[in-house]
From Swiss-Prot:
The chain crosses the membrane at residues 9-29, 49-69, 94-114, 154-174, 202-222, 246-266, 273-293. It is a multi-pass membrane protein. It is found in: Cell membrane. This is UPF0182 protein CLK_3152. The keyword Isomerase does not apply. Pfam families: UPF0182. Its main location: membrane.
């Protein structure tokens, strides 16, 4: 027996080790990785919190269960159920082990589930905003109330668990006794047996349950600020005047009932316990009835008047929660009275009008600039750079390795040789080549660079497509980039990675379930494994409590490529704020900057006023840096994030209204404008463009994220919503309200105007008939002074699998003028150089009469040849025919 006991503990430890083997390996690797990225203290913050919490919670659980068990055993020994039972200590030892395991398990579950809420509670930061019902700071609801709710659920669950296990224990012991004593089970004696066995214990537990029902209704009182019963989110008239009153009564009565219950136990009386439970149930049922009666017989017929103060609470706090309370609102009286001087004064804005569109440009990149089949461009970013002394908006993208495309896709190729992408491409958004393709300023491998932007180390070890580990500094040289018939190789000179000692090779062989770590002769002691290379997953691994933007963007700085990811703090616990997409508060509180070569990951706080990010900073010391610590050249490229702007636009469509009466009537609802990408195609919500523009009262151009609003379910544009992002203007928002008594074309109405123009529609029909497809680009509506200039690029795509869309024409519209031109500059000249549109139209008709028919036929011939060459992929012939067509058209002109 002693030998068996001696073997039990080591056997138990071995079983635990086997059960948690993979977790142990993963834990060791995590320690090594967090140490490598200099965030080990962040990783240990969670572990330290869990361990510190587990100790007192384990003691509480262990002692509570043990004392409860002892009290049951005392009653058992006095009762009939104990006759004939074995009285040795084996049962006590068994229960001790059981209690120890259960208490450890429960303590771990609780600590690992709620460590974060406890730390948030302890490091609470005031919002300096109070809710209008209970006058508590918002921090109470965001940082403290969630912990109270969690504790309530855990304690109620534990008390119910004790009740259930008490009944189970009684029935097991009763059944055991009856079997041993060979007596029949009498159901009539169960009530007496339970009272004798655990009457006091169950009464105490019942008293505690009633006490915590009181606490639960106190939580329900606070949760009224999230009520959805009224016409707006948050506590309504019924909630405040009926539900709240009953909740308060229930809190008081249940508190008294719990005291009465405990006193009754001391006196040995159980009837008051039943009465208290009955009263509690009656009050809970009565509350629902009372709320129903108030809502239907008092509120319903007077709803607009009674609900106004609560609607105002909802409006004010929703606007605060989504950072819409600081929008600068201005009237934009459309005059359309631009002069030539106004055009000259806004030359930088006009020179940066985007005629390249996202989707066609990405297609072109992935056909022309991937160089080799194993490269890819994941997406295109838009940014602004000073190029050769001029402020330019550009498209740019990183050329990453697509390891899934490798052929052969061997372990060495995937993890040792093709370790990184190479280079970037950049083109100005406002210019195309004579063939209608993006006009590159940075392209090719090695980079051909026409700018003053240095790119001396264009390697990409960390990116959006780098989803696998690589091993660097091996005996095999890494593939760097292709050069004619040979390949350039490279040795990694960055500091990322974990050294591949034998122990580490063994750990990763187990972790990755790959024996190659041990068998490969290419791995040296100095070799390093680089893991967590996907930039978003890397940021999430370090700071999983932040929400990350769906579109990281690249920046070229100091000769290298860097990535910027917008990080958000969110909650769904902001009082009175209407939830959107599962949240009712959001701030872009941090920017994550990642080096594409070294993998250095830095978190910069960009919104010091946000209490949630300050709460995180107190919990995770050393994680965040101040914004000023980021290099100036990086800060210049911080963008206002589109994900945030999108949700703010959605909220603004309803919450631009500040008057509760108008809000109640739903009189003034907006929606983001619709747009159409294909001629006769479906409509979709317009994608907010980043544009370079000079705000009406400003002297300098800047990049602005702009959205266009319509009246709900109408196509008339009603407002322009912009977010600024250059220099000290970063984060400022402005709303231009357009005149409601005029028809202002939205992007969709602008498309309809194009389709209804006889000259343009004929041109579009001609292109579509020639075996090609006409596609619209990205619609831009540019405010200039008190006028709106509309721009629509037109793309032509030949039929065929590998056809490339090409930007062939630009449609411009100003006031009542609509022109189809080969470029922005030509279109501007055509619109603004004619003082009398009627004379201009007459001249056009006269010039049409004098055109030589033979030249028209020749132009049509070269056009048809060009289309045929495009279909066949003969780009040399295509270019020649287009040039000939251009010469003929110039002669006609």
């Amino acid at each position: 027996m002693k030998n068996r006991k001696a073997l039990f503990i080591p056997l138990f430890i071995i079983i635990l080790f086997i059960a948690f083997f993979n977790k142990i390996i993963n834990f060791i690797i995590n320690i090594k990785w967090f140490k490598e990225v200099n965030y080990l203290t962040i990783y240990f913050t969670k572990m330290r919190a869990i361990i510190i919490l587990m100790i007192p919670i384990f003691i509480i659980f262990f002692i509570s269960i043990w004392m409860y068990y002892k009290s049951l055993m005392i009653n058992k020994n006095k009762s009939v159920v104990d006759i004939g039972l074995n009285k040795n200590n084996y049962g006590k030892k068994l229960f001790f082990i059981f209690n120890f395991i259960v208490s450890i398990f429960l303590a771990y579950i609780f600590s690992s589930s709620y460590w974060y809420r406890i730390l948030q509670f302890n490091n609470s930061v005031d919002f300096n905003v109070k809710d209008p019902i209970f006058f508590k700071d918002v921090s109470f609801y965001v940082f403290k109330l969630p912990l109270f709710e969690s504790l309530y659920k855990v304690i109620i669950s534990l008390l119910l668990f004790l009740v259930i296990t008490t009944f189970i224990a009684y029935f097991i012991l009763e059944a055991k006794y009856k079997i041993q004593s060979k007596k029949d089970i009498n159901l009539k004696n169960i009530n007496h047996g339970i009272k004798s066995f655990a009457g006091k214990q169950l009464a105490i537990v019942s008293g505690l349950i009633i006490l915590f029902i009181s606490f639960g209704h106190l939580i329900k009182i606070w949760n009224l600020v999230y009520s959805s019963n009224g016409v707006s989110f948050g506590a309504s008239y019924t909630d405040v005047h009926a539900t709240l009153l009953f909740y308060k009564i229930i809190v008081v009565i249940t508190l008294i009932s719990s005291i009465v219950t405990l006193l009754s136990i001391v006196k040995g009386k159980f009837k008051p316990v039943s009465i208290c439970i009955g009263i509690t149930i009656f009050l809970i049922v009565s509350q629902n009835i009372a709320s129903f009666l108030v809502q239907n017989f008092i509120v319903k017929s007077n709803e607009k008047t009674l609900e106004q103060p609560y609607i105002k609470n909802n409006i004010d706090l929703t606007r605060k929660a989504f950072a819409l309370d600081d929008i600068e609102i201005r009237d934009f009286d459309i005059k359309n009275d631009l002069q030539k001087q106004d055009i000259a004064d806004n030359k930088a804005s006009i020179d940066n009008i985007r005629i390249n569109s996202f989707k066609p440009t990405l297609e072109f990149y992935n056909q022309v600039q991937i160089i080799r089949y194993y490269y890819t461009f994941n997406d295109i970013d838009i940014d602004r750079y000073n190029i050769n002394g001029k402020y330019n908006q550009v498209f740019l993208a990183a050329r990453e390795i697509d390891t899934d495309a490798l052929n052969p896709n061997t372990w060495q190729n995937r993890h040792l040789i093709y370790t990184h992408g190479f280079g970037a491409v950049m083109n100005k958004v406002n210019s195309v080549t004579s063939e209608g393709q993006p006009d590159f300023v940075i392209k090719d491998i090695p980079p051909y660079n026409k700018t003053n932007i240095k790119l001396t180390n264009p390697r990409i070890y960390f990116g959006e497509k780098t989803n696998d580990y690589v091993i660097v500094n091996t005996k095999i040289n890494e593939f760097d980039y292709p050069k004619e018939d040979s390949n350039k190789t490279n040795k990694y000179n960055g500091h990322a990675g974990i050294k591949m000692s034998f122990i580490n090779r063994l750990l990763f062989a187990i972790n990755k379930k790959d024996i190659n770590f041990l068998l490969s002769k290419d791995i040296k002691k100095d070799s390093k494994i680089i893991i967590n290379r996907n930039i978003v997953e890397r940021a999430k691994k370090i700071a999983p409590f932040l929400t990350y933007d769906s579109d990281p963007y690249m920046v070229i700085y100091n000769g290298k490529i860097y990535w910027i990811i917008d990080a958000y703090t969110t909650t769904n616990r902001y009082p009175y704020s209407e939830p959107y997409d599962g949240i009712n508060y959001i701030r872009n509180s941090a920017k994550v900057v990642i080096d594409s070569v070294d993998g250095d990951t830095n978190f910069y706080i960009t919104d010091k006023k946000d209490p949630i990010v300050n709460n995180y900073a107190k919990i995770f010391k050393g994680l965040f840096k101040e914004e000023k610590d980021a290099p100036k050249e990086i800060r210049e490229h911080f963008r206002y994030p589109k994900d945030l702007f999108s949700i703010q636009s959605k909220v603004l469509g309803k919450y631009h209204v500040k008057d509760p009466g108008v809000f109640y009537n739903g009189e003034d609802l907006w929606e983001v404008s619709k747009d159409q990408k294909h001629v006769e195609g479906e409509t979709n919500t317009n994608d907010a463009p980043y544009i370079i523009m000079k705000l009406p009262d400003q002297n300098k151009e800047e990049m602005v994220l702009l959205n266009y609003f319509n009246v709900m379910k109408k196509d008339n544009m009603i407002a322009l919503f912009g977010a600024r992002m250059d220099g000290e203007q970063y984060g400022k928002k402005i709303l231009y309200k357009l005149p409601s008594d005029k028809t202002v074309y939205s992007p969709y109405l602008f498309k309809q105007k194009i389709n209804q123009d006889t000259n343009i529609s004929k041109e579009l029909s001609l292109w579509n008939r020639e075996g090609s497809q006409v596609q619209y680009g990205d619609t831009i509506i540019l405010p200039i002074k008190n006028s709106l200039l509309y721009i629509e690029p037109l793309y032509l795509r030949a039929s065929g699998k590998n056809s490339i869309p090409e930007m062939k024409r630009v449609i411009l519209s100003y006031n009542d003028r609509l022109v189809l031109s080969s470029s922005i500059q030509e279109g501007i000249k055509e619109i603004f150089n004619s003082k009398d549109n009627k004379i201009n139209d007459k001249n056009e008709k006269d010039s049409t009469k004098t055109i030589d028919d033979s030249k028209l036929k020749k132009a049509q011939e070269y056009y048809n040849k060009a289309i045929e060459a495009q279909k066949n992929g003969d780009w040399t012939k295509y270019g020649e025919d287009i040039n000939e067509l251009g010469n003929i058209l110039n002669n006609i002109k």
